[in-house]
């Protein structure tokens, strides 16, 4: 029988990428509102460009947030602290254009009439469909390509911030990983792309010589630290700063906007996406909270050994608490003779997907040990610090199918 063989690619970007700068500012503003008023309704969008930050959106809250202070703090933490970057924390302009949320929307989300079940009193913040996914390719039950891509730019940022080696690094960077699959299993890494912003070449060194130094450093100190040696071979291609010099970057090189890296934020294209971004949105927005809950469902199903892959879709109508639809697909990998219909029937009873139930389950209105800003770079999934990554429902799922 002939083997099935194909290639699959995912990308990521660093915290210094302009779109991620915007995401982190939006989520830092959200964090401050939530800290002051857990019932805050926030939709915060950020625009960053050369020397300028604009923060706008709709808010219903009792909290008061210093947008300028928060934006400058985030930009400092990322590392844009030098005037030569043309986007610098203390000198950039910061304009706040936040205003009140529509009362029409708020009325549908927070219903005050007497409803017996508390979880039925909070409707979805909007219509839409959200997806969750999990698979057995990595210990985190994430697709391997996106997990490697996230780790590459995270390690690159850690090296830059430590300041001991590769001191020429600047904040903006991108990564991309191409995997070769044989019979649906990861066989090897076919190509790795890393582009990183950097200082000008040192005096006495040519551009070509400096790029060779950067290439060697990234292969040895980043790629080989992240990707298992057994997946790299003599035919693996490394494309490091393939266009050469990359001095101009960040918001000076490209304008950044909140919500433009939704595939980087999720599964790297290995699973569907409903289209709604996450950052800057409070947990009443199901674009965010239901995507987290869907990942939680999918991950627990895979962790319980019910399937090797699982996609979960959930959809909502604005102002209505209960999902309009729930769909589970294990892509033909269900175990123990189970069907997708059987898995879905039990999952719907075990996982309450009403917005307030999701908020309570993960303490999304009072984060403990994490904050929304942390989600805004290096992925919302596959990181154990977040409560939707817990697999505490495994035992209950196994019991439901008499597998315990």
Curated annotation (Swiss-Prot):
Signal sequence, renumbered to the chain: none
Positions bound to ATP: 17, 172-174, 245-246, 254, 260-261, 277, 281
Free-text remark on how the cofactor is bound: Binds 2 divalent ions per subunit. Binds 1 potassium ion per subunit.
Region (Flexible loop): 101-111
Transferase is among the record's keywords: yes
Localization of this protein: Cytoplasm
Residues given in the record as L-methionine binding sites: 58, 101, 254, 285
Annotated catalysed reactions: L-methionine + ATP + H2O = S-adenosyl-L-methionine + phosphate + diphosphate
Residue positions binding Mg(2+): 19
Any one GO molecular-function label of the UniProt entry: ATP binding
Protein's UniProt keywords contain ATP-binding: yes
Names of required cofactors: Mg(2+); K(+)
Binding site for K(+): 45
Pathway info: Amino-acid biosynthesis; S-adenosyl-L-methionine biosynthesis; S-adenosyl-L-methionine from L-methionine: step 1/1
Entry similarity comment: Belongs to the AdoMet synthase family.
The protein's name in its UniProt record: S-adenosylmethionine synthase
